[in-house]
Amino acid sequence: MNRNTTTNKNANLNNSRNANAPGEAGHQNKTGLIYWTNPSKSGASFAATLVSLLILRNVNVISVLLKIGYMVLFTSFAVELSTKVLFDKGVVSRFGMQESPDLVGVLKPHIDRELDRLPALEDRIRKLVFAHRTRNNFTIGVSLYFLHGLFAIFSMNTVLIMTTIFLYTVPLIYDRKQARIDRAIDRMKDLVIHRFHKNYNKVVEKTEPYIDKIIPPQTDEGSYSTSISNENKSSTSQRNKSGLSSSEFDNMNDTSASKSGKDSYSTSQYNRAEYPVSQNENIGTLKSGKQEIPTEKDFNNRHENFSKPDVKTYDPRTVDIEEELAAHQRELEQNLKDGDYNLVGSKEIPDPITVPAPTRHTTKPAESQSIPIKNNETLHKTTHGLKQKLQHA
């Protein structure tokens, strides 16, 4: 009576526990040795595996097998020889096994069954190696990396013993406490993600120097847009610091850009050896240096302050370009009338390097013609070419 009452109480208690924790009912229709559905078989296989691994760890199996082999051979040899000497017939050859066991018939079904599974295994390996699913490729690659580190630290036998213990314990614990373990894993995952987002800026600041060392910043044409955006940001910050308006700051930038443009054009033209020449002058003669050299007095009279030509820059937002060009054209025509040959390579004006300085004539000079000037850059290019000619001469 009392025994039945105690049994019923235990059964009700177990049912209430299973109702409160439905995810921890146990086994959940899973069968196999590792889930201990049959404790006797699972315990026997677990014990046999551990004992065999311990034997392999403490005993040299190859040495034992070789010792057993030569002992069997020496024993059969001694018995066969002694019986032939004493009885004229060998006992071992007479009463020994006359036919070999049919190992092929026993092993062939098992081998065929395993070979039938081989094509599917080959297909899975092929898809894994050639990354048909990158997630599986990455997951198994990480697993192999950790296994490599594990085998580098521990011996193979130790790893096998640890694997056997985990194989027979971890699935059973997870099967019985699945809901609780899943909640703990989700909590840890959320905590890691929260900490990562919280410390994201610190991680970026600490890793940025190392990333710059591994991947240096681009300096080629591909980084042109990035450099332009950075330049715009720096100019904006500079304008805000100086307290200038946008129009005043743009005028300052245009002036500095025109100055730098002169220097860069002069350097590039000199490096490429592109010198403007007159129509009747050969470029080979100019590069060989055989042309007539003008005197220093003639050079000073014609080209004062030649190293820094007075070339104005224009802002199209504040200056009328056509009016300025007309004024420059009138100024150049007046200089040409006065004898200041400031252009090289034109059809109307001779080259001052190949033609000597003009002498005074009593005859009436020919009527001068106006030379069209496209823009102020023409004057700068021609005067710079004359300077390079004189330097090479």
Curated annotation (Swiss-Prot):
Keywords, alphabetical: Endoplasmic reticulum, Glycoprotein, Membrane, Phosphoprotein, Transmembrane, Transmembrane helix
Coiled-coil intervals, chain numbering: none
Phosphoserine found at: S278
Ranges of biased composition (kind: Basic and acidic residues): 289-313
Biased composition, class Low complexity, residue ranges: 1-21
Bias (Polar residues): 220-285, 365-376
Annotated region described as Disordered, given as residue ranges: 1-25, 214-313, 339-393
GO biological process: endoplasmic reticulum inheritance; endoplasmic reticulum tubular network maintenance; endoplasmic reticulum tubular network organization; ER-dependent peroxisome organization; response to endoplasmic reticulum stress
Residues that span the membrane, as ranges: 61-81, 150-170
Cytoplasmic-facing ranges: 1-60, 171-393
Membrane topology term: Multi-pass membrane protein
Domain Reticulon intervals: 30-236
Basic residues bias (residue ranges): 381-393
Single GO cellular component term: nucleus
Lumenal compartment spans: 82-149
Protein's UniProt keywords contain Transmembrane helix: yes
Subcellular location: Endoplasmic reticulum membrane
Claim: Transcription is one of the keywords in the record: no
Primary localization: endoplasmic reticulum
Xref: InterPro entries: Reticulon
Name of the protein this chain belongs to: Reticulon-like protein 2
Source organism of this protein record: Saccharomyces cerevisiae (strain ATCC 204508 / S288c) (Baker's yeast)
Gene: RTN2
